[in-house]
Amino acid sequence: MSFLWDIMPIDKHLSTVPETEGCQQRIETRICALPDDLLLQILPHVPTKEAVATSILSKQWRYVWLMLPKLEFKDEGSESVGWFIKKSLQLHKAPKLDCLIVELGPHCPIDVDVRKWVENAVNRDVKDLDFTLLWSAAPTSFPKSLYTCDTLVCLTLSNQILVDVSSPASLPSLLDLSLHYVVYKDDGSLVRLLSSSPVLKRLSVHSHEDDNLKTFTVKVSSLESLNYDENWLKDEVEDNEVDEVVDNEVEVDDLNGSLVIDSPALKELHLSEVWDYCLIENMSFLDEAFISNVPYPDEKFLRSLSSVKHLFLLFSKSMVACCNAIKFSWLIEFYFFPISLVDWLMPLMFLLQNSPKLKTPTIDNDFECLSLSWNQPSSIPGCLLSHLETFRWRGYGGREDAKKLLMTYILANSKCLKTVEISLLATCNLEETQKELKSMPRISQSSQLLISTKKLWRINERTYL
């Protein structure tokens, strides 16, 4: 019962004496004297297995756990976990079950009836349902009643789960949906699931190669946040080959599938390891975009990001041709991560020219890259003249002449500059590089120059190493 001792108010004189048998009995007596209402607030914060164990403390405690609004079961390798969950749900007497979390590991027997557990939760107006099936059984479908649960607010389905929405569905309260490494019966099941959620705000997807979908379509008018990760290819490619994979020229017809996003209310978009063709439409309210390893973007894809205020962009060779054509009229914060095979200096200057309100650009090229070319722009980007306040460069080495010229240009023309944060490559001559940076003229005399070897930046309250 130590988990309860940790949160109980203990008298000062008790906290300074050894835990003798008498002292422990006094503490247990105080715990048992707590009112039921307080116990029902405490027990949801401990594992259900521990909460059930409290029933042996006293007659008062025997039935307390039966009224808990939240049950959480995580398989720790026990073959009896299925029996324990089944009996717990049978004995649980609360009229409503707000939250049910179940995680079954690879050693769990495959004959447990998870469908009945889901049915039990749905029948008791569950609000938060989270199932992770890591067992060796084939993907398991859930009862149809799950997809017509009008109280469900958060739904998380992970791993060996078959999303089968064959009949009309209705999830009028669903706000958060997470689909992680699941399998879909067909494209229609996904479409019906999303279209049945009229107030859905947040969608998180981790897809894999064998999910049985040709096209992943996200058409949700209410959606505000989308996190889509397709990392199956990365697992098959060595780290030193990723850059080459990103920049291989591939025809759209050769791709395995496609990602289609049509969500006009979207404010946050995170795309990572998206190896399929990506089509984005109707995103005029997009505020933040995190684009990492999207190898085949076209101009239409990048143009769909033009309304963002915060942009993280892993910059690939296929993006070079689009830089001069797209205006980022509202961009304030820009994290620019060019891969090693790209001559990126001039594309970056185009992006600066097309981002008149940019305040905080960050360059991250923490690697040795190919030879870069530099041509001084014919006109100074507007953001340098009137908006740019903080300039960051992670992985500055100072050895390449082109990089020195870019750094000199930024410092010499950024009139509103307040802070320059430089993280140096460990391979460079630290003393010489610091001296060189300090000697570069700055038009903003009040600006601070901060130089370190630490590799930590914060973007829109997120930390990136």
UniProtKB/Swiss-Prot annotation:
Keyword line: Leucine-rich repeat, Repeat
Domain named FBD: residues: 373-424
LRR repeats: 154-181, 182-207, 210-230, 248-273, 339-365
All copies of domain F-box, residue ranges: 28-74
Pfam families reported for this sequence: F-box, FBD, LRR_At5g56370
Domain of life: Eukaryota
Transmembrane segments: none
Protein name, UniProt field: Putative F-box/FBD/LRR-repeat protein At1g22000
